[in-house]
Design a protein with these regions (language model features):
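Conserved redox-active cysteine motifs that mediate thiol-disulfide chemistry
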Residues: 55-70
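Structural alpha/beta surface segment adjacent to cysteine/selenocysteine redox centers
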Residues: 92-112, 121
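Bacterial Sec-dependent N-terminal signal peptides
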Residues: 1-21
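N-proximal helix/coil linker or "cap" segments that precede and/or mark the start of modular domains
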Residues: 18-31
Length: 163
């Protein structure tokens, strides 16, 4: 019985460490954000998707929590992968990417994470304050799904409204 508890404890510890490792380096302070966002826009255009920029940093617990919430939920993961090319835009002491954030209307004023949606041509069409997606000490999965769906290419396609 003691061995079972030790094994279970080790499993929980290693699983928690592997999840924290998955989010430890979401944001790259050394990245050329302008260049990488341009590549994301190019990819989005080719795949008929939008770009979802997640502004934040590796220091941001809420940023990591959001990424884990989406990655660990099959429905959310499916929606985001079907409709968006995701880019993590760094904001940290090492690199605040001030010019890039300025280009998108200073969304850091909302705190982090902050979400910027670009259409397939790279135009900013929406900025989302993450506080509207939060619930308690986590995120509301239904609100995240609504956000992704409301700002998807299909939601903004005029063909879907010409009846």
């Amino acid at each position: 019985m003691k061995a079972l508890f030790i094994t279970l404890g080790l499993f929980v510890f290693l699983n928690a460490r592997s999840q924290s490792r998955d989010t430890a380096h979401l944001y790259n302070p050394a990245a050329d954000a302008e260049k990488e966002i341009a590549a994301a826009v190019k990819k989005a255009k080719a795949e008929h998707k939008f770009v979802l920029i997640e502004g934040g940093g590796n220091w941001c617990g809420w940023c990591k929590r959001f990424s884990l919430t989406v990655a660990n939920d099959a429905k959310l993961d499916s929606i985001v992968n079907a409709d968006f090319v995701v880019y993590h835009l760094n904001y940290s002491a090492e690199n605040k990417n001030q010019q890039v954030y300025a280009k998108y209307g200073y969304p850091q004023r909302f705190g982090f994470p902050v979400f910027i949606v670009l259409d397939e041509s790279g135009n900013r069409i929406h900025t989302e304050n993450s506080v509207y997606l939060e619930e308690g000490k986590g995120y509301n999965k239904e609100k995240i799904a609504e956000f992704f769906t409301a700002w998807s290419p299909a939601a903004l396609d005029p063909k879907n409204y010409n009846n």
